Amino acid sequence: LLISSKGFQSYLEKEHRVHSDRIVYMPQYAEDLFTQKLETVEHQDVNLVFAGNVGIAQNVDTILMAADALKEERRIKWHIVGDGVDLERCKEMAKTKGLNCIIFHGRKPLEEMPYYYAMADAMLLTLMDDPDISRTLPGKVQTYMAAGKPILCAANGEVQDVIHEANCGYAVNAGDWQGLAKYVKRFLEQRNSVPFGEN
């Protein structure tokens, strides 16, 4: 059995009594265009980019709440690049909170995505608090890492493990917008001295 996340191994062994000899870990790969050196995009602000599906499982509320907590930090721009069933609600939430620092770009073709990665000072990753989701490793993790970008994350389980092992960013528990805001501030203070993203 091929698994894309190590979190599935213990689940298969315990719940389905699959012997470890039958399980092979094969993580998802990043598209080649993200493994090449990204062109530099000159910018004055600090750009934090979330890329991908904007669904219930992605818990983008965590980003919006962190942005709300840090809205006095006017140099931070929070970019949401993607589409999904929760996008319109997130837009409405941002509007209600007066979060002009959040920019919704909508869905973009794959060939345009390197631009958004190049403009990013760090990438954002959030997931909801769910035991099944905590066993997964979203493909965007490999893509973020392949692009050499630091990851600021609020998710449980496998994602946290990978970020800590690779030393490629900061991770807090799913839904912890206060913790995410704290680490965004720390990233701002240390981004020129801590070599995150060199993975």
Regions found by a protein language model. Name each.
Residues 7, 26-29:
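Carbohydrate-associated surface elements
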Residues 2, 30, 41-58, 63-67, ...:
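Conserved donor-binding/catalytic core segment of Leloir-type glycosyltransferases
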Residues 125-134:
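Short Ser/Thr-rich beta->loop micro-motif in glycosyltransferases that lines
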Residues 45, 77-82, 88-114:
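Nucleotide-activated donor-binding/catalytic signature segment of Leloir-type glycosyltransferases, i.e.
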